[in-house]
């Protein structure tokens, strides 16, 4: 942009151009002046905005921590000290300041750098993070290990290095964070917890803890008075020399007055704050002081999510995680098409009108799961529990016991946190709870921590559970409607995708444990196909979102003169084995395709059923037992040998 060129020339002429591209490690910014730091922050924001505008990613959270990142890197020695970013979707400035500027244009792309911290990328990335509330426990473990190992080294007087856990106020609502807080308070090690308070997790925070932090923010009077006492004492050396105990006791008395009910103080922490999270100098002064303490510390900073980009400041929830967008006005690029999340959102509003017993629960993701619409229509029947998936599930069990019909909407990758609660608190008592697993299967661009490929293997073994997988918008609505009237717990898994093309057969009524057969002759083909036998010799068994690739494969096989039918399972659990065998008999080749891991998945189970029935030539395609990296959906499927071409090759 022309304005940016003039801006950079203006800065360069005044010696203020810091040249972000030349920064290779945090030590490079240690001697920057105040003006150079302000320029650096501006350059970082411009780079983040331009890259996320092109690639998509987490924008608002990253724009909010630019000054905080700079202050941390200037206050700590990165050769020995560890900075751990909770969730780590706010690590973009961290990456730009640790030698990854040249790779930053490939952020979240196939083969590019991750949108989260990743140990394989840099020694400055201490953990592979992606889920919330882990940093305090990880940081405490790292600090404890360093301390114990240093104690075993003879004649070693060097410090093992500081550990800093940066956690947001939203992530601090997670139970794991509180477990870590309690343990760190007990051990009394100098773990430094930086509480990044922007009043948001993804959407605006709700609940008691959010209100509690707001009250702490009001205690800024204490910090102002304390700083005034320090400044006064420093100006008159005799006071510090002869009355140090009096000053200390006076400040402790003030602390008791203003922070009498401060949870962190009660847990055994030194509490400092709240600080302006966009004032580098103020944060540096505090960070350099607290790292000298011999006890755990909470440094409370207030930041603004989306800072520096007006559209993100105005709507931080929209720009939390966003696809490619226009930098000029913040509008999302590309046509807006109906997604499975949209279908769920609309259907829940309709069902909520029909049945007053329906209640909805989410874990800090009302907009992402589509439940924001339900919350607006029926606020008294909507519960956002914060980042607390375990509580969400057990809470739902209690609601079901009380006679309501709870619908719990959680991403597939996050439901992993609550498997014990699903088993013990819902499936065991056979409570009627409906779990809507959004982002199931291959999830583009977010990488290993966000793939939804484990839910089938994790849940198929749980008694009493019914698991459904829709292949179209109509099937999703049909399954959700049916789930309301079912008994016991029900899981419906669906992808982060635009809805598949509707076929007439998808409108068939649900029949427990049975799917629907799609004949090769019913598939539309744009190309002239070779003549095929009237009887199909290949059967492609699939479920859910993989109907797209499987249909493409069947059409390609048809063009080669191979007639391939498709069996859409619909039910992942239970499976009517007798009916399934009757469908499969007569086919020479059977290919089973799923968007979950093969080990423990639906494919292995069906293969066992068919082999027991003496059927042969069966192939199972699914994700390998490994963590799947980032890329578009097509790239992820190709890497896992699950593309339409791979399915076609298996069917030949």
Question: Across the structure, where does each feature detected by a protein language model lie?
Answer:
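Structural signature of the thiamine diphosphate
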Residues: 243-311, 432-437, 456-505, 644-652
């Amino acid at each position: 942009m022309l304005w940016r060129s003039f801006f950079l020339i203006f800065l360069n002429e005044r010696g203020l151009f810091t040249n972000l591209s030349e920064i290779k490690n945090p030590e490079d910014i240690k001697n920057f002046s105040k003006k150079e730091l302000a320029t650096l922050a501006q350059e970082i924001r411009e780079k983040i905005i331009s890259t996320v505008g092109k690639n998509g990613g987490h924008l608002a959270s990253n724009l909010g921590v630019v000054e905080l990142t700079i202050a941390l890197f200037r206050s700590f020695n990165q050769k020995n000290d560890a900075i751990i970013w909770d969730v780590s979707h706010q690590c973009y400035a961290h990456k730009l300041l640790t030698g990854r500027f040249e790779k930053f244009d490939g952020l979240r792309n196939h083969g590019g750098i991750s949108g989260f911290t990743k140990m394989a990328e840099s020694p400055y990335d201490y953990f592979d993070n992606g889920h919330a509330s882990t940093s305090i426990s990880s940081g405490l473990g790292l600090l404890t290990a360093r301390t114990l190992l240093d104690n075993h080294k003879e004649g070693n007087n060097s410090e093992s290095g500081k550990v800093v856990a940066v956690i947001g106020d939203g992530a601090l609502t997670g139970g794991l964070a509180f477990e870590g807080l309690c343990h760190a308070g007990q051990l009394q090690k100098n773990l430094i917890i930086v509480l990044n308070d922007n009043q948001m997790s993804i959407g605006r925070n709700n609940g008691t803890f959010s209100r509690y932090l707001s009250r702490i923010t009001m205690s800024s009077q204490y910090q102002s008075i304390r700083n005034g006492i320090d400044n006064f004492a420093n100006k008159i050396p005799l006071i510090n020399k002869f009355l140090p105990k009096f000053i200390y006791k006076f400040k402790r008395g003030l602390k008791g007055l203003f922070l009498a009910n401060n949870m962190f103080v009660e847990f055994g922490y030194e509490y400092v704050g709240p600080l302006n999270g966009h004032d580098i100098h103020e944060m540096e002064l505090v960070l350099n002081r607290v790292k000298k303490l011999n006890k755990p510390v909470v440094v409370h900073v207030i930041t603004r999510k989306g800072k520096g980009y007006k559209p993100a400041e105005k709507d931080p929830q929209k720009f939390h995680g966003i696809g490619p967008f226009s930098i000029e006005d913040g509008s999302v690029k590309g046509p807006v098409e109906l997604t499975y999340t949209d279908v769920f959102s609309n259907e829940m509003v309709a069902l909520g009108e029909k049945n007053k017993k329906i209640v909805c629960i989410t874990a800090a993701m009302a907009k992402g799961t589509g439940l924001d619409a339900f919350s607006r229509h029926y606020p008294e029947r909507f519960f956002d529990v914060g980042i607390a998936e375990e509580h969400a599930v057990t809470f739902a069990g209690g609601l079901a016991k009380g006679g309501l019909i709870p619908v719990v909407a959680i991403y597939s990758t996050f439901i992993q946190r609550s498997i014990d609660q699903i088993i013990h608190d819902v499936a065991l008592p056979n409570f009627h709870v409906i779990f809507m697993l959004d982002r199931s299967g291959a999830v583009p661009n977010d990488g290993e921590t966000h793939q939804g490929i484990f839910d089938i293997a994790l849940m198929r073994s749980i008694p009493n559970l019914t698991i459904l997988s829709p292949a179209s918008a109509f099937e999703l609505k049909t399954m959700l409607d049916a789930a309301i009237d079912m008994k016991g717990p029900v899981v419906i898994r669906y992808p982060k995708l635009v809805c598949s093309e509707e076929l007439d057969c998808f409108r068939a009524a649900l029949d427990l444990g049975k799917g629907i057969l799609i004949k090769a002759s019913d598939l539309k083909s744009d190309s002239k196909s070779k003549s095929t036998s009237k009887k199909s010799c290949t059967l492609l068994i699939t479920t859910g979102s993989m109907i797209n690739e499987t249909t493409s494969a069947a059409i390609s096989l048809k063009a080669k003169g191979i007639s391939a039918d498709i069996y859409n399972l619909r039910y992942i659990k239970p499976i009517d084995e007798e009916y399934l065998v009757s469908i499969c008999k007569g086919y020479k080749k059977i290919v089973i395709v799923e968007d979950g891991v093969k080990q423990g998945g639906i494919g292995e189970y069906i293969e066992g059923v068919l082999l027991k029935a003496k059927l042969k030539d069966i192939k199972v395609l699914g994700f390998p037992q490994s963590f799947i990296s980032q890329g578009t959906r097509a790239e992820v499927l190709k890497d896992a040998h699950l593309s339409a071409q791979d399915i076609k090759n298996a069917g030949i």
